[in-house]
């Protein structure tokens, strides 16, 4: 304490999980007598009992510090859940404690909910006076009520503001500040996604990875889903549900209530895999042919398990459970994945096979009839995903069925989000979504929720949604983001920790990393800002791509930055097994977005993709590049008819997060030419804009600067103090124990160079140099980590 307090009583509540944390063997209390910590005299009742407060009394003392010492019990850890110290009545008056909450963003003309708090000791009066004020900022701030801690504020002008909350108890005062970034509304209308329709890949980087997913990983997932001995459950649950619907006895469900999920994801992956042109590759063609037969078999079985009103969830059907009775049963989550698989199936068929698509509409319509404002049922999901799927369905049916066909699905998505309140941080139901400004809780749920919010914000233009989404983006990217693009420290249950708490034994669940890609892509569609695709690229090339090994024979649920754990074939919760391939095989969707008269080139991959409905025509785009190993890219533009539109080419900024600083700085373009003639385009929001009339055969060539960069973390990230990481373009690099001592020191003066190694890890650009002790170092791309055993780390000591 800053001032001496008087006390004669304290309580302690021990943490005991009957596992790794147990009650202590013994404990002692000490206090600071002015020169040393001494035993607390006459303490009585100091207990070691679980599930209660252990109260201790003693003769009154005056001190500035108390110390609690305890001895561990065997090999178990020991901890305290809560420790209370009681004022005996003679302590001095302490200033109030004031908190203003987290920094946030506001999209005009929206408002921000200020959730300040004030704690006081009740001296000299029961409650202090409080006041909100503007400390700085370019415009006027209007508070709904400046005299209460929780209120709202609006801003007359865009810019950066600092708001102050002050509490005064009559003798002393204290204050706290919150930073608010106020921005203008995003441009309207938002951009549109590019569906993954038939495409080619020539990239020497991407083609073998996509091939291995199709030839190795997806067949493995199919085998697991079809094996009746796999305890997690699979396609057999749909057969059992169909038996129950047909009135046949003995139907039995296998696995968790959410066991339909990985079957839907695997079906979706198979459908998207059909979009890749095998280009004469017999292995790809054979795998695709086999998967087409599986698709037909699975679709028939899934449709047989759909109830007459459109509802589908096999365990509920088999066991007769009541719908919408337990938000933790993943009803919405699985429905969302069914819808997304159905859309992929419809796209795969070129719109010629409507069975799954019609089933998805029946399922969504079932939810629309039952869930919503009174007199319908109030409801929100325990695991978000359906919100994204409903908006995706809405956008798709607007194309297939006409304008207005998707309105009910957007309304339902917004209702599910708006209903989140009075719950827990774990599933982001602790506050209304429009008042959530910090990324908290389970990371997959969070990123799916935030992506769904971004979708709803795009479709409705709701500024409170936009403000919350921008605030959450800042929290994720600038406070809780791993240098690999991974999300979720795992300090809470598979989720986010405190700001700047980013230990390297991180969780970074593969599903959460895929959610981050969805989130950033939606923000790019909202703001047309290249920084979101800089982040998407970072996550794609590192956190997601490293989720499977090079041969796509094994995968990993988590992606720590310091680990010796090998990937594996399956998991007790195989939620990621289909998410990874459906994400990576959707490469065209991450590569391009479009506007009415514009195409955005967001990623660089040797490929041929057709973008439809731009300036009234379709445009075939063929990229030729060896990126990320080489920065040269050639793009051939082939519109079906000559049209005027803007081609927006992302100019990467490797400085993606305020948490990390890269040196040397490497940004911009080295060159840009149209049809062989050098041009200097306008660069706006991270895009080089080429607005002209395009005809078939036009070419654009550009070169991106690529070089080795050192990365240093913000000093508030304790785990990385005195450490350095390396990157090359979008790739973060790892040091592996099979090549060197991963506890060696990489001096700041060490010379580093990139070198191509065609025979290592399928062909990679390594970083070479020497450690401070003169021994050679070798760093490999993060995505290729742990393919040779041993330990693999991102951050090395630099002193």
What label would you give each PLM region?
Residues 209-249, 293-311, 358-374, 411-429, ...:
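Long, well-ordered core segments of solenoidal/helical folds
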Residues 1-92, 380:
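Aromatic, loop-rich ligand-recognition surfaces of beta-strand-rich domains
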Residues 124-131:
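Solvent-exposed loop segments of extracellular immunoglobulin-like
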Residues 93-97:
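Proline-centered linker/hinge motifs at extracellular inter-domain junctions
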Residues 133-148, 680-681:
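Low-complexity "stalk/linker" and mucin-like segments enriched in Ser/Thr/Pro/Ala/Gly
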Residues 469, 534-542, 547-639, 659-674, ...:
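C-terminal beta-rich recognition modules with glycine/proline-rich loops and embedded aromatic residues
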Residues 186-289, 322-350, 384-408, 436-474, ...:
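Aromatic (Trp/Tyr) and acidic
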């Amino acid at each position: 304490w800053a001032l001496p307090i008087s006390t004669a009583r304290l309580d302690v509540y021990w943490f005991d999980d009957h596992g790794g944390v147990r009650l202590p063997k013994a404990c002692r209390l000490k206090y600071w007598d002015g020169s040393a910590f001494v035993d607390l005299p006459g303490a009585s009742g100091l207990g070691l009992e679980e599930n209660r407060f252990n109260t201790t009394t003693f003769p009154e003392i005056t001190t500035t510090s108390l110390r609690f010492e305890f001895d561990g019990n065997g090999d178990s850890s020991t901890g305290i859940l809560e420790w209370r110290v009681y004022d005996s009545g003679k302590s001095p008056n302490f200033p109030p404690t004031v908190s203003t909450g987290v920094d946030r963003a506001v999209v005009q003309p929206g408002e921000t909910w200020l959730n300040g708090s004030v704690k006081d000791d009740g001296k000299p009066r029961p409650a202090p006076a409080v006041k909100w004020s503007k400390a700085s900022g370019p415009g006027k701030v209007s508070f709904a009520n400046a005299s209460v801690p929780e209120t709202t504020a609006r801003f007359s002008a865009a810019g950066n503001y600092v708001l102050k909350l002050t509490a005064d108890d009559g003798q002393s005062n204290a204050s706290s500040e919150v930073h608010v970034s106020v921005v203008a509304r995003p441009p309207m209308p938002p951009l549109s996604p590019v569906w993954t329709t038939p495409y080619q890949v020539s990239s020497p980087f991407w083609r073998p990875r996509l091939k291995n997913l199709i030839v190795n990983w997806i067949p493995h997932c199919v085998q697991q889903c079809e094996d009746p001995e796999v305890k997690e459950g699979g396609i057999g649950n749909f057969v059992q549900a169909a038996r129950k619907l047909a009135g046949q006895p003995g139907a039995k469900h296998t696995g968790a209530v959410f066991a339909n999920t990985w079957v839907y994801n695997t079906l979706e992956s198979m459908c998207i895999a059909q979009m890749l042109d095998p280009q004469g590759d017999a292995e790809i063609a054979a795998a695709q042919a086999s998967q087409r037969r599986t698709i037909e078999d699975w679709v028939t079985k899934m449709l047989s398990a759909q109830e007459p009103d459109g509802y589908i969830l096999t365990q509920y059907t088999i066991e007769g459970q009541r719908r919408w009775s337990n938000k933790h049963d993943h009803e919405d989550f699985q429905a969302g994945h069914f819808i997304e698989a159905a859309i992929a199936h419809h796209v795969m068929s070129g719109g010629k096979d409507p069975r799954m698509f019609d089933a998805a509409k029946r399922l969504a319509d079932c939810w629309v009839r039952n869930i919503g404002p009174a007199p319908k049922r109030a409801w929100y999901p325990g695991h978000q995903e359906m919100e994204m799927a409903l908006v995706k369905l809405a956008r798709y049916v607007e194309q297939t069925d006409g304008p207005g066909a998707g309105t009910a699905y957007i309304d339902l998505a917004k209702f599910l989000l708006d209903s989140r309140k009075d719950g827990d941080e774990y599933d982001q139901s602790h506050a209304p979504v429009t008042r959530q400004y910090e990324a908290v809780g389970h990371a997959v749920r969070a990123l799916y929720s935030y992506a769904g919010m971004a979708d709803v914000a795009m479709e409705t233009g709701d500024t409170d949604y936009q403000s919350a989404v921008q605030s959450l983006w800042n929290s994720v990217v600038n406070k809780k983001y791993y240098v690999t693009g991974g999300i979720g420290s795992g300090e809470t249950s598979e989720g986010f920790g405190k700001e700047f708490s980013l230990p390297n034994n991180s969780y970074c669940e593969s599903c959460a990393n895929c959610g981050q890609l969805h989130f950033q892509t939606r923000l790019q569609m909202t703001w047309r800002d290249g920084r979101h695709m800089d982040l998407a690229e970072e996550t794609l090339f590192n956190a997601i791509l490293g989720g499977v090994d090079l041969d796509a024979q094994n995968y990993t649920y988590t992606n720590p930055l310091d680990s010796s754990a090998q990937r594996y074939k399956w998991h007790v919760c195989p939620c990621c097994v289909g998410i990874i391939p459906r994400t990576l095989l959707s490469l065209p969707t991450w590569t391009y977005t479009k506007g009415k008269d514009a195409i955005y080139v967001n990623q660089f991959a040797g490929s041929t993709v057709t973008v439809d409905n731009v300036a009234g025509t379709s445009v075939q785009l063929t990229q030729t590049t060896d990126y990320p190993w080489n920065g040269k890219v050639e793009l051939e533009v082939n519109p079906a008819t000559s049209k005027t539109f803007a081609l927006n080419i992302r100019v990467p900024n490797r400085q993606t997060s305020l948490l990390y600083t890269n040196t040397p700085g490497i940004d911009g373009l080295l060159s840009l030419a149209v049809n062989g003639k050098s041009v200097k385009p306008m660069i706006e929001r991270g895009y080089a804009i080429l607005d002209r009339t395009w005809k078939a055969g036009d070419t654009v060539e550009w070169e991106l600067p690529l070089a080795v960069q050192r990365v240093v973390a913000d000093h508030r990230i304790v785990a990385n103090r005195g450490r350095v990481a390396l990157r090359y373009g979008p790739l973060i690099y790892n040091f592996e124990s099979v090549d060197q001592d991963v506890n060696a020191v990489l001096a700041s003066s060490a010379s580093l160079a990139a070198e191509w190694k065609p025979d290592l890890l399928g062909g990679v650009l390594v970083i070479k140099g020497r450690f401070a002790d003169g021994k050679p170092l070798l760093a490999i791309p993060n995505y290729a980590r742990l393919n040779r055993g041993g330990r693999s780390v991102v951050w090395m000591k630099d002193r």
